Each structure stands twice: as C-alpha cells, then as structure tokens.
UniProtKB/Swiss-Prot annotation:
Positions annotated as active site in the UniProt record: 311, 370
Protein's name according to its UniProt entry: Citrate synthase
SUPFAM superfamilies per record: Citrate synthase
Pfam name, any one: Citrate_synt
Superkingdom of the organism of origin: Bacteria
GO terms under biological process: tricarboxylic acid cycle
Subunit description: Homohexamer.
GO molecular function, one term: citrate (Si)-synthase activity
GO cellular component, as recorded: cytoplasm
Organism field: Rickettsia conorii (strain ATCC VR-613 / Malish 7)
Length: 435
C-alpha cells in the first residue's frame, strides 16, 4: 500500500556508532507522520525497542482515524458521533469493509446477504453440549467460532475472491453463536434467527425469546444497542485487532483469525473492562463511599483501580463515552429507572468528582467507552458475563475490515517482532546428578 501524500525528500537522521542513517518520513493524510525504520535492522545491525508498541505503526490503513488528544474518532473519514446518531450498524459495517457508504440498492443487497448467512450448521449444536453449564459464554463463543473452520474447509486455502463473502458470513454468524452461547449457559433452548427482523432486532430475539414466548423488541432498546454496536465496530490497531492481523499475516484461515481476536478481547484490560466497571460500582455500593474509593484509586499501594477511566490513546473525553452517556439516560428513562437506578447515580457522581480532581485532570483520565456501556446492558437485562460477547459481535466488523485490508496490502508480510535478549549468554549442560 502506498500513500500518495508521502514525500521522499523528508528524512529523519539516526546516528548509531558514529554512522548516520537517513530514515524516510512517511506522511499521514491526517495525524502523526511516521518514521520508516523497516531497513534499520539490515543496515545498522540493531533493532528498535518499543514495549507495548506505543510508538510503532505496524501498517498503513485507511479504515479508522483517532486523535486521542482532541477526542476524535472517524471511520473512513466520518465522525463516530454522526454515524452513531444517523446510521445503523450494517451500514457502518458496509462502510468499513468496502470503504464507502452504500447506495440504497447496495444496502438492501448487503442486509439480505447477512440475513441469508445467519444460520449455523446444525452439527455445531453438539459442540455446545460438550461444555459444562457454568461455562463462561466467551469460552463457548471462542471455541464455536474457531470450529467454523471445520464447516468451511474451502476457506482453509482462501483466495481474494473469498474476502467479501467471508466477511459477510462472519458478521452474520457471530450474533447467532453469541446468542447460542448465552442460551446454553442458562439452560434454555437455542432460538433460530428470524430473517424478517433487522440485525439488532434479530439478536435481541435470539437472546430473549423462548419457544413458548415471543420477545417484543422495544425500539428504544433496539436503537441503543444499534448505537453500542456502531461505537464498538472498530478502533484502529488495538490489542485484538493487532492480534487478528498478526494471525492473518501467517495465512491462517479467517475463522481462526477471528477466534484469536475474541481471545484477546476477553482480557479485562481490553473488552472485559465494562464488566469490571459494573463490578467496581457494586463494590462502591453507594454514593457516600465515592470519596473513599477515589482516595484508594490515588494510593499507588492500594490494588483498587478506577475502572472505565483513562485510555491508551485518548487523552481527552472518549467521543464514544459521550454518546453512551446520553444513550444510557434514554434507555433508563424508557424503562422508568432514570431517577432511581443506583448504577447510573453512582456513575454520574463518580464522573463529576473525578473530572474536578487534579489527580485525574493532570493524568488526563476521562471516562472511556466502557464506563456507561455496562450500565446500559444491565438495564436491558443482559447479564455481565455477556458484555464482552456483545463487544465481539460489534468488533467482528472491524476485524474483518482490517483482515481484508491486510491481505490486499502488498507490503504486508508475516509478522515477526524482535526482542531485546537479556538472559544468560551461554551455559554448559550438566547431568541431573551433577546439579
């Protein structure tokens, strides 16, 4: 992939052992430029060191742009707030995968294809029965998504012509598997997709309907979940997306790649953070105890951490959190809980106190996307163990867009990070009786 804005006349100079190396500066269309260090190891006989890849761009991408200092998030140039307020999830999915918003005909064809592929193979049901009833839905989902490789053996050696259909299949089947994971975890029968419903309605139907009870979708709840899905659809090169790209760089089949993304997302520092926020609010218990927990958060010797605040990229208010705060109020108002929901009351007071505290201001710790999403889920009747599962439904769109872009990029190679070795130089082996 080449960037038309790159100016080969600009270089950075790196001096190593008295020798100067000229490194090209690659120009971004917006945001920070990048120093190309790809030739350093070959020419200077050394590597760069960047724990956590905080200063490393692993790829060029046209999908998502983030300005953490200004609190900006854009997909293909469109502001996230505009997409959340004016679009729907499958339209955003189309945008991320194809690069442009669809026409009416393109949108209709795309949604029909997603609906057509929402069923999963009946034999997958037997896989669910191998799990104990107490299994976490993320564990079940992780195994089920990886097992799709067995049902689509033709994609073990996929071709460029398979990219789009693969993305559609993945977007369609992940919600079905997610709902099945939930149903199995609570001992209820699986509910089949209903193609007369839209994407978000269908997921709620599979989650909450039973063979003897029809679930009527509340439009406020549906719209809120639609926004949540949009806000979680992609977020540049985060841990799970980078994991998908790294797995994909080896040529692994797309189902295996997405399962690695799900595994990475499950971590409490990534997709599991919204569940941690709910647990934190439960621990705080009442607004009167907020000052106590603020003090605990400031104490470096105290293991307590204020969940839902701060972000590796954002040093301003997360634009997704701003949308979710208002969405949370809309949902609770619809459900008659706006004035008496203890989770919202604690969250709002906690945010207000933290945003006025110099400790948090100096460290630029603002509410992130996880701070309010869990409260919305809980109000909807979605249990906390399903929070990260819903995150995975939304992020599958971003993972597939990034996976597709990676395979279309001629510059991409199999990922192979290097290390700074600090272990023993050499040791002689001794038999066990001599040690």
């Amino acid at each position: 992939m080449t960037n038309e804005n790159n100016n080969d006349s600009e270089f950075a100079e790196l001096k190593i052992r008295g020798k100067i190396f000229k490194l090209p500066i690659l120009k971004a269309s917006i945001g920070e430029d990048v120093i190309d260090i790809s030739r350093v190891s070959a020419e200077a006989d050394c590597f760069t060191y960047d724990p956590g890849f905080m200063s490393t761009a692993s790829c060029q991408s046209t999908i998502t742009y983030i300005d953490g200092d200004k609190g900006i998030l854009r997909h293909r140039g469109y502001d996230i707030k505009d997409l959340a307020e004016k679009s729907d999830f499958l339209e955003v999915a189309y945008l991320l995968i194809y690069g442009e918003l669809p026409s009416g005909e393109q949108y209709n064809n795309f949604t029909k294809q997603v609906a057509h592929h929402s069923l999963v193979n009946e034999r997958l049901h037997y896989l669910f029965q191998t799990f104990c009833s107490s299994s976490h839905p993320m564990a079940i989902m992780l195994a089920a998504v990886g097992s799709l490789s067995a049902f689509y053996p033709d994609l073990l050696n996929f071709k460029e012509a398979d990219y789009e259909l693969t993305a559609i299949r993945m977007i369609a089947k992940i919600p079905t598997i997610a709902a099945m994971s939930y149903k199995y975890s609570i001992g209820q029968p699986f509910i089949y997709p209903d193609n007369s419903l839209d994407f978000t309605e269908n997921f709620l139907h599979m989650m909450f309907a039973t063979p003897c009870t029809k679930y009527t979708v509340n439009p406020i709840i549906k719209n809120a979940l639609n926004k949540i899905f949009i806000l979680h659809a992609d977020h540049e090169q985060n841990a799970s997306t980078s994991t998908v790209r790294i797995a994909g760089s080896s040529g692994a089949n797309p189902f295996a790649c997405i399962s690695t993304g799900i595994a990475s997302l499950w971590g409490p520092a990534h997709g599991g953070a919204n569940e941690a926020v709910i647990n934190m609010i439960k621990e705080i218990g009442s607004s009167e105890y907020i000052p106590k927990y603020i003090a605990k958060a400031k104490d470096k010797n105290d293991p307590f951490r204020l969940m839902g605040f701060g972000h590796r990229v954002y040093k301003n208010y997360d634009p997704r959190a701003a949308v979710l705060k208002e969405t949370c109020k809309e949902v609770l108002k619809e459900l008659g809980q706006l004035d008496n929901n203890p989770f919202l009351q604690i969250a709002i007071e906690l945010e207000a106190i933290a945003l006025k505290d110099e400790y948090f201001i100096e460290r630029k710790l603002y509410p992130n996307v996880d701070f309010y999403s869990g409260i919305i889920y809980k109000a909807m009747g979605i249990p906390s163990q399903m929070f990260t599962v819903l995150f995975a439904i939304a992020r599958t769109v971003g993972w597939m867009a990034q996976w597709k872009e990676m395979h279309e990029d001629p510059e991409q190679k199999i990922s192979r990070p290097r290390q700074l070795y600090t272990g023993y130089v050499h040791r002689e082996y001794k038999g066990i009786r001599e040690r």
